[in-house]
């Protein structure tokens, strides 16, 4: 009887161990898949190969888009023999229907997309020959949806900037129309904004994004629908901040609210991947073409 009891105990122990191991198999399998995924990321080649390319220390901001063609899907080109010239320090607004190629042009300026044919010249140099890592140090982007971190206002404004002086920070706060807002907070610049800036309004978040761009003192500004989701009061405050940001800097703007681009030096109307009209706001309104009709529909 004792031997039988002993064997039963051994058997139960072995069965329990085997059962536990079987239950662990799915977890081990998922763990191995995760390890493989992490390994693929760590071992992957860089998306951009900047080795041997020209490092740039200064940028004037003159752009030439020469016979530019690009397609995400070979069956439908997004940019179709686009030709544009943007002078250094000039503000150009890109307008048109969704899918016209506006955001693709911005991605070309940043260097995220490479042309299938044609060239993008920066200060007369083909961007394919430029070290994009050094080039992007001269760019600031203000997107439609502000990207804030859960730290303080100070942290969000100065993020990525190595040398910070209180004088420069105060100048940026004034230029971004943040002074009255920050002075009204008990903790001022050290106020915690919450996850994704959840404790702030849309206009406040956007002005902090503009201040962050100003801190970088960029040569090239990219504004992607920076005022599209704001009320009229917030839009006015942000428009003033944007005017300070874009002064004497080459600026690319994508806008659907055409009233916000009256001050642009040039407006490019895009359709089917190429520029159909090009000129100042007053010139295009006098032309009474596509831009005129688009503006009339928004009145």
Predicted features by range, described:
Residues 8, 15, 136:
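Conserved catalytic core of two-component sensor histidine kinases
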Residues 47-58:
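Pre-NBD coupling/linker segments of ABC/ABC-like ATPases
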Residues 13-41:
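Cytosolic ends of transmembrane helices, especially the final helix of ABC transmembrane type-1 domains
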Residues 27-30, 47, 69-74:
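An intracellular "coupling" helix at the cytosolic face of ABC transporter transmembrane type-1 domains
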Residues 40, 47, 158:
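Conserved E/DxxT/N motif and adjacent residues on the DHp alpha2 helix
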Residues 56-299:
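ABC-type nucleotide-binding domain
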Residues 1-9:
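Membrane-water interface of transmembrane alpha-helices in multipass transporters/channels
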